[in-house]
């Protein structure tokens, strides 16, 4: 088992991660689930890499003010614009929802959008389903944070470990699993809500929709 500093050295030489696996507006927790899966990282190891001063069991809020973007860029090897869009902006007038909100069909494709955490967004723009916060099996809610336990349970309830998705999900690339028209609908909604931010910060969502 590699020590945390050895994980960081190993990832500095290159990680098993392809930016083309991502969709426009993908939330940081969704990105981290893909990254952990591709690089066989435990929740504790990944938490230490992205926020070494944070207790992995306590976790950290997925907001821009609480996460060091430069470190995140170095570990994940993604453009800063992509990562900024993946995090909630606490300066926006709309409050973020404290519980993990998801579309069950998107979850089945291994995708979660940062837009789903905005309280005034109540439906998935691709599948037109109401966004859920409760586990389909036990009814519990999962807090919208990143922690060792959250990383270890992608698209699963923290209380009972039941899957939030329909059927077995693909953890890596969402692109082949989701219809192009659905990807376009998600991108359009993202641009409508965060258009200036997306374009100005250089997240370059267009290639992900090809």
Predicted regions and their residues:
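Domain-exit/linker segments immediately C-terminal to small folded modules
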Residues: 132-210
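A structured, charge-rich N-terminal accessory region that forms the first stable segment of a protein
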Residues: 1-99, 104, 110-112, 177-183, ...
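Residues immediately within or flanking Cys/His clusters that coordinate Zn2+
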Residues: 97-103, 121, 132, 154
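An acidic- and aromatic-residue-enriched active-site/binding cleft used to recognize and process polar
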Residues: 119, 127-129, 162
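Active-site-proximal structural scaffolding
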Residues: 65, 117, 150-153
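Short, solvent-exposed secondary-structure capping/transition elements
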Residues: 44, 115-116, 133
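Short, cysteine/histidine-rich loop/knuckle motifs that typically chelate Zn2+
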Residues: 102-106, 123-126, 137, 159
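Short, intrinsically disordered, charge-biased short linear motifs at domain edges
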Residues: 86-94, 108-114, 120-126, 140-148
């Amino acid at each position: 088992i590699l020590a945390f500093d050895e994980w960081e050295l190993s990832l500095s030489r290159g990680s098993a991660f392809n930016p083309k696996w991502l969709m426009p507006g993908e939330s940081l927790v969704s990105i981290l689930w893909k990254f952990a899966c591709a690089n066989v990282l435990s929740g504790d190891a990944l938490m230490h890499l992205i926020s070494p001063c944070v207790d992995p069991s306590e976790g950290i809020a997925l907001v821009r003010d609480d996460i060091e973007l430069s470190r995140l860029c170095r570990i994940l090897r993604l453009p800063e614009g992509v990562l900024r869009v993946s995090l909630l902006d606490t300066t926006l007038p709309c409050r973020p929802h404290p519980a993990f909100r998801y579309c069950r069909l998107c979850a089945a494709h291994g995708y979660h959008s940062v837009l789903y955490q905005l309280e005034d967004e109540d439906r998935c723009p691709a599948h037109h389903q109401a966004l859920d916060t409760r586990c389909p099996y036990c009814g519990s809610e999962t807090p919208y944070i990143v922690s060792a336990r959250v990383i270890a349970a992608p698209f699963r309830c923290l209380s009972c470990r039941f899957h939030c998705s329909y059927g077995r999900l693909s953890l890596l690339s969402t692109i082949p699993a989701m219809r192009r028209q659905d990807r376009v609908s998600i991108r359009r909604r993202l641009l409508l809500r965060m258009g200036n931010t997306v374009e100005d910060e250089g997240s370059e969502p267009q290639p992900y929709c090809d």
